[in-house]
A protein has these predicted regions:
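Short, low-complexity N-terminal intrinsically disordered segments enriched in polar/charged residues
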Residues: 1-36, 40-42, 136
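A solvent-exposed, acidic/Ser-Thr-rich amphipathic alpha-helical stretch
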Residues: 27-79
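Short beta-strand segments enriched in hydrophobic/aromatic residues
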Residues: 34-35, 95-97, 128-130
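Acidic surface patches and DE-rich sequence motifs
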Residues: 42, 99, 117
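A short hydrophobic beta-strand element
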Residues: 73, 85-95
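Hydrophobic/aromatic beta-strand elements that line small-molecule binding cavities or substrate pockets
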Residues: 76-81, 94-97, 109-116
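Short beta-strand edge/turn micro-motifs at domain boundaries
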Residues: 91, 104-136
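Short, cysteine-centered beta-strand-loop-beta hairpins and adjacent loop/turn segments enriched
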Residues: 97-105
Length: 136
């Protein structure tokens, strides 16, 4: 039986690293923050992400879009752990978008399932945007 790896970073440290990659536009860093395969889940369907190039393409396009909207950075807020067991974290958080001056420029709520890789780093296995739907 395989041993469950121990995380080398807290979930707050992981999301700090992840939002750092988003802020600096570090496409390779972003691709490395995901498990392969991983899953993007929305009410419109599920997308299996089986190759890091899919992540690179997605985040390159996303960087162009966010920069064109004046968003220059992002930070994680309100990290909520719904459950954590060895090797798996399940929870949600708010990504706060920042303008050129570091002022808040919008919020995006997301849910994640994060796994611990064999080397102890955390990686996103499932991501779900929670604000991509009309509110009732």
């Amino acid at each position: 039986m395989k041993t469950i790896p121990t995380a080398t970073e807290s979930i707050a440290e992981f999301f700090s690293r992840y939002t750092g990659y988003l802020t600096t536009g570090d496409i390779e860093g972003l691709a490395s923050a995901y498990n392969y395969p991983s899953l993007a889940v929305t009410a419109l369907g599920c997308l299996a992400i089986t190759d890091p190039q899919q992540s690179r393409d997605f985040f390159t396009q996303g960087q162009d879009f966010y920069r064109s909207c004046g968003i220059q950075g992002v930070r994680a807020r309100d990290i909520t752990t719904d459950i954590e067991v060895p090797g798996i974290w399940l929870g949600r958080l708010v990504l706060e978008n920042l303008d050129d001056n570091g002022a808040p420029a919008g919020l995006e709520r997301n849910a994640y399932q994060v796994v611990t890789a064999e080397d102890g780093t955390r990686r996103i296995a499932v991501s779900t945007p929670l604000d991509a739907y009309p509110q009732p």
